[in-house]
Amino acid sequence: MPRKGPAPKRPLVNDPVYGSQLVTQLVNKVLLKGKKSLAERIVYGALENAREKTGTDPVITLKRALDNVKPALEVRSRRVGGATYQVPVEVRPDRSTTLALRWLVSFSRQRREKTMVERLANEILDASNGLGASVKRREDTHKMAEANRAFAHYRW
């Protein structure tokens, strides 16, 4: 624990195109090697692609996808008397959003489509329909928490 206390959270600016902080967070997750304009081009292209396929506002589609991917529970390692237990804990709202965005981007990078724009758009669309690898990751996380429910009394 730092002596000065926790570092203050920096305020996120709203995205200039959609006016959404979620889109800004998504751009920052796609960002690699400081190439922000490339990350913005990828995200905006993916959202436009999603708009063409669904005919609805892409930010609403993104929010629906995130709601389907956000975990409610996760497991944390806790050492008790020489044994390490996987203890299920509830996920804070900001962490669940961060995890959902991280999973969306990482699983879209593993997809087979030709461009990153197509991969991200299809992963967002799949997640908004309750399909895709990122939704499966959430289900696996919940299954792991449920399987280790016996250790919930070690929560801190």
UniProtKB/Swiss-Prot annotation:
Keyword field contains Ubl conjugation: no
Keyword rRNA-binding: yes
GO biological process: one example: translation
One GO cellular component term noted in the UniProt record for this chain: small ribosomal subunit
PROSITE patterns associated with the record: RIBOSOMAL_S7
Origin superkingdom: Bacteria
Keyword entries, A-Z: Ribonucleoprotein, Ribosomal protein, RNA-binding, rRNA-binding, tRNA-binding
Pfam family, one: Ribosomal_S7
Molecular function via GO: rRNA binding; structural constituent of ribosome; tRNA binding
Subunit structure: Part of the 30S ribosomal subunit. Contacts proteins S9 and S11.
Family to which this protein belongs: Belongs to the universal ribosomal protein uS7 family.
Its job: One of the primary rRNA binding proteins, it binds directly to 16S rRNA where it nucleates assembly of the head domain of the 30S subunit. Is located at the subunit interface close to the decoding center, probably blocks exit of the E-site tRNA.
NCBIfam families: rpsG_bact
Protein name: Small ribosomal subunit protein uS7
Organism the protein comes from: Mycolicibacterium paratuberculosis (strain ATCC BAA-968 / K-10) (Mycobacterium paratuberculosis)
